[in-house]
């Protein structure tokens, strides 16, 4: 037999965000970094807000977060990609290839403070990177774990 059902707890993973760019956007990459806009297929749960330019995702609550991204561009470039938190590079998310490529990705679990602002960037080369339309050009997933 089973005991009485307990009180329903809160779901930490109800704090999430998903957004991508399927528009083939041409991004003017600067050496210091250019945020990638993610205006398409947004599914933003409570606890995360997105900026008007669809480039900054701000978390309301401190915690451990799963963050993953993928970027696909139409022509090989010797460009790099990363996640930034409040404008600073997040260690473990930098993809800096030695040879020109068209695909970039990283996944991390990291601790964020309330109010931290997350962005996806291309950086390290003065170039125009055109996001793919045959595969998602750019994808960002954020999930609060604890």
Where do the protein language model's features map onto the residues?
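Extracellular jelly-roll beta-sandwich "head" domains, especially the C-terminal globular C1q domain
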Residues: 4-146
């Amino acid at each position: 037999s089973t005991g009485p059902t307990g009180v329903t707890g809160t779901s930490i993973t109800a704090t999430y965000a998903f957004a991508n760019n399927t528009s083939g956007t041409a991004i003017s990459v600067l050496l210091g970094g250019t945020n990638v806009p993610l205006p398409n297929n947004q599914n933003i749960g409570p606890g995360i807000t997105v900026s008007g330019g669809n480039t900054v995702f701000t978390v309301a609550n401190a915690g451990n977060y799963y963050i993953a991204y993928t970027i696909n561009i139409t022509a090989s470039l010797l460009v790099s990609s990363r996640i930034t938190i409040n404008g600073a590079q997040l260690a473990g998310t930098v993809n800096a290839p030695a040879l020109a490529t068209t695909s970039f990705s990283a996944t991390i679990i990291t601790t964020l403070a309330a109010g931290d602002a997350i962005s996806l960037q291309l950086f390290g080369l003065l170039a125009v990177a055109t996001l793919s339309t045959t595969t998602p050009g750019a994808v960002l997933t954020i999930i609060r774990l604890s």
